[in-house]
A protein has these predicted regions:
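VWA/integrin I-like adhesion module and closely mimicked acidic/polar interface patches used
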Residues: 51-142
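Residue signature of alpha-solenoid helical repeat architecture, marking inter-repeat boundaries
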Residues: 272, 277-279
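Von Willebrand factor
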Residues: 4-43, 53-56, 80-89
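C-terminal "exit" segments of structured domains
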Residues: 101-245, 249-250, 256-270
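Active-site-proximal beta-strand/loop segments in catalytic clefts of secreted hydrolases
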Residues: 1, 47-51, 79-82, 154-157
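Conserved small/polar residues in nucleotide/adenosyl-binding loops
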Residues: 305-306
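Loop/turn elements at helix/coil->beta-strand transitions in domains of secreted/extracellular proteins
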Residues: 39-44, 70-77, 147-150
């Protein structure tokens, strides 16, 4: 083909000022707009993206995008980024061109699974890490697999991503094979979850401790900045200590639920879900120590200001 013509076509694509990544909608529109050209030829889409797409439209339109592509035998090849481990977002450094201020912009970048399988908190607040999952985003991998395409993971390290190269890991393919994410449909996985009590429990624990939920955010996100006024500081510290008590009860209850379900863990056939159990249990225990020390530090500082 004419490479220059292809480049011109790419350069002619207008910039979308909305900032939204309507990936599934774009796939559907592309197939529909070009399906009349498919006669005795193999249709293929090459999807190049550094995000995982809008979560709302991904949830609603992924299967429609797959079925639309299948209807004309269109294969989907994706050049994309590695998903964040068990988390929908990452944060990218952006320097304001006028002020020079650095801002951390939230970007959709995962997870590698149909539903999050890890805690969304780091113990103090919602996660802001960039731990590598070893796999591509669920939607992009599923589209590729279901249409007999391929997901190609871009290999370069993103220096502007939060933590830079500190959280970048390279995994051996064979070592990761037992931990491959389930790429079946969300509907199928939801039904299977209802039949497997341990997976249901893990989902409940993740949901109960999710700082993205507005109804639990006041408890699962602790205060990280305080007034420099001594009286106001003490009042804020006392309020946070009360929240810590509630949070510790949350965590203790979750730990007890996980311990009571250990027998289910021994019967679980998926190595990935066994690992999910182990990691979440360890985090719950560790977070209790973290919150206890946080409360103790507030107490020590309060005594200084009284």
């Amino acid at each position: 083909g004419n490479v220059d013509l292809i480049r011109e076509a790419i350069d002619a694509v207008p910039v979308d000022p909305s900032g939204l990544e309507r990936m599934c909608e774009a796939v559907i529109a592309t197939v529909v707009d070009h399906r009349d050209y498919v006669k005795n030829r193999q249709m293929a889409i090459i999807l190049v993206t550094d995000e995982s797409g809008e979560r709302k439209t991904n949830n609603a339109m992924l299967e429609q995008a797959i079925n639309t592509a299948k209807s004309v035998g269109c294969r989907i090849y994706v050049l994309g980024r590695e998903a964040i481990f068990g988390y929908p977002y990452t944060y990218m450094r952006w320097r304001h061109p006028q002020t020079g201020d650095v801002h951390w912009l939230q970007v959709d970048r995962g997870p590698e699974t149909a539903f999050v399988e890890q805690l969304q908190t780091n113990g103090f607040r919602r996660r802001r890490d960039a731990f590598s999952s070893g796999f591509g985003p669920y939607e992009q991998c599923r589209m590729s697999v279901e249409t007999n395409g391929i997901f190609f993971m871009l290999p370069t390290v993103e220096v502007d991503q939060v933590n830079g190269q500190a959280d970048k890991r390279r995994y051996e393919l064979e070592a990761m094979r037992p931990y491959l994410p389930d790429l079946s449909s969300r509907f199928e996985q939801l039904g299977l979850r209802g039949e497997l009590p341990m997976r249901t429990l893990i989902w409940q624990v993740i949901t109960d401790l999710n700082p993205w939920r507005e109804d639990v955010r006041d408890v699962t996100e602790v205060r990280m900045s305080f007034s420099i006024n001594a009286q106001q500081f003490v009042a804020q510290a006392r309020e946070e200590q009360q929240n810590c008590i509630i949070y510790l009860r949350y965590l203790a209850r979750a730990q007890k639920m996980m311990e009571e379900a250990y027998e289910l863990r021994t019967k679980e056939t998926s190595r990935r879900w066994q690992a999910n159990y182990d990691l979440i249990y360890a985090q719950i225990v560790g977070y209790q120590a973290r919150i206890y020390e946080y409360g103790a530090a507030l107490e020590a500082l309060s005594l200084i200001h009284i």
